[in-house]
């Protein structure tokens, strides 16, 4: 940490005798550690020296070159890629929309359920953004009624609520944090099984040298990029397509009825709100 700011590392290839030290990239000051290119014993030893350099300076996160083969050496020294979770939560609504597009789910027809074990700023922001164009949006979270009521008052959105013990029938269930995966198509937002590719402007040649997603996460963490200056380029679902079990026809119909009943409750609540305005 330097002056209250967490110093992030930057792993660079040594080509002409470069020395470890500070380096500014995309407006952010990094602690640069140089390592040899290629693979083999010499490259592995060089990676270990670079990792030790960052470790001694208490650097916990570093941006690595594209397809760098010795990231595990750094991990053993406690140096990992920048955490993606803060950016992923900030871009949750856009990630969900990308996943919907990949699955061919039209906002005006798809039933989307947002599931969480507790309320969070990320859940509320995603619900608020998605309620603008997703016609059938449901919340499955403790005190979800409060958020649904807020969205009805603020946005006029018809957001339904489901109890956490109800079976969820949705075209896509989006799970925040450690919410148990329901049946059907699931987007486990915080899982590493979901791959998200990001983009931003003015990276220049840096995007060709370093892992672009790691670099963007580092820029976001350093406040060099705002969330609205970053976009989601692609979302890749788990290999099995996010399918978590197959519902029988009876259970599927029961789940559909639960969703419809929740929708009717939301419509009734909306009418009640209108009468009291």
State each model region's role.
Residues 102-166:
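Glycine-rich phosphate/diphosphate-binding loop of Rossmann-like nucleotide-binding domains
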Residues 28-107, 202-241:
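Glycine/serine-rich phosphate-binding loop and adjoining beta1-alpha1 elements at the start
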Residues 21, 34, 188-277:
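Adenosine-phosphate binding glycine-rich loop
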Residues 20-22, 71-78, 147-153, 168, ...:
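Short loop/helix-cap segments at secondary-structure boundaries that form the rim of catalytic
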Residues 1-27:
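N-terminal basic/disordered segments at the start of proteins
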Residues 157-209:
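Rossmann-like adenosine-cofactor binding region
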Residues 1-2, 51-59, 75-76, 105-108, ...:
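Flexible, charged surface loops at secondary-structure boundaries
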Residues 13-14, 37-38, 64-67, 115-118, ...:
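Structural motif
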């Amino acid at each position: 940490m330097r002056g209250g700011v967490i110093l992030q590392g930057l792993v660079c290839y040594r080509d002409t005798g470069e020395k470890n030290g500070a380096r500014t990239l995309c407006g952010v000051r990094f602690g640069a550690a140089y390592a040899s290119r290629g693979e083999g014993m010499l490259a592995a030893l060089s990676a270990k020296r670079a990792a030790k350099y960052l470790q001694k300076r208490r650097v916990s996160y570093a941006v690595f070159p594209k397809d760098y083969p010795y990231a595990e050496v750094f991990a053993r020294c406690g140096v990992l890629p920048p955490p993606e979770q803060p950016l992923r939560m900030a871009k949750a609504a856009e990630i969900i929309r990308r996943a919907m597009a990949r699955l061919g789910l039209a906002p005006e027809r798809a039933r989307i359920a947002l599931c969480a074990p507790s309320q969070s700023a990320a859940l509320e922001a995603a619900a608020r953004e998605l309620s603008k164009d997703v016609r059938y949006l449901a919340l499955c979270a403790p005190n979800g009624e409060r958020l649904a009521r807020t969205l009805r008052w603020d946005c006029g959105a018809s957001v339904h609520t489901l109890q956490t013990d109800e079976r969820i029938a949705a075209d896509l269930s989006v799970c925040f944090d450690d919410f148990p995966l329901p049946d059907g198509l699931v987007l486990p937002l915080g899982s590493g099984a979901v791959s998200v590719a990001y983009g931003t402007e003015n990276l220049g040649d840096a995007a060709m040298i370093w892992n672009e997603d790691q670099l963007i996460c580092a820029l976001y963490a350093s406040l060099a990029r705002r969330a609205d200056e970053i976009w989601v380029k692609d979302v890749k679902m788990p290999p099995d397509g996010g399918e978590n079990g197959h519902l029988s026809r009876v259970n599927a119909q029961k789940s559909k009825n639960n969703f419809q009943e929740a929708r009717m409750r939301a419509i009734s609540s909306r009418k009640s709100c209108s009468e009291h305005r």
